[in-house]
């Protein structure tokens, strides 16, 4: 039933392309809501997989709200880009690739937006090598993870202004 109605997500690029690719591979419709400032190369790459791309809002959070609205109105299955344990586990396979390519790696630096990527990477990296140090890196003007850690709970920033569009998230996920 999900396949017939289609998938929807909000993303500034990488997750968008992943969902679009998977939908094409499994023969279902994908609608991707991206912030209006998303680089054209990411928009075009997402479209190249057959997804319907909707540009909406200034930042990820605006696109997310609109994607949720469309999901509810149309019965689409929403695939969250970071606040989903299965998605985070998939993103964690990056750690496996890093360790295979660099067996003596001591540190892995991970960009932090919503927190899913660092949750997945740190989980798998630590399973493969408990001594690996994982360092999260986030923009000063979109430091939602830092704010959450300082507050001891998820908080929403007033804004998330950064050129690093994949990390421009006002609040980290509460599941990862």
Where is each model-derived feature located?
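Helix-rich "cap/lid" substructures immediately adjacent to catalytic or cofactor-binding pockets
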Residues: 1-6
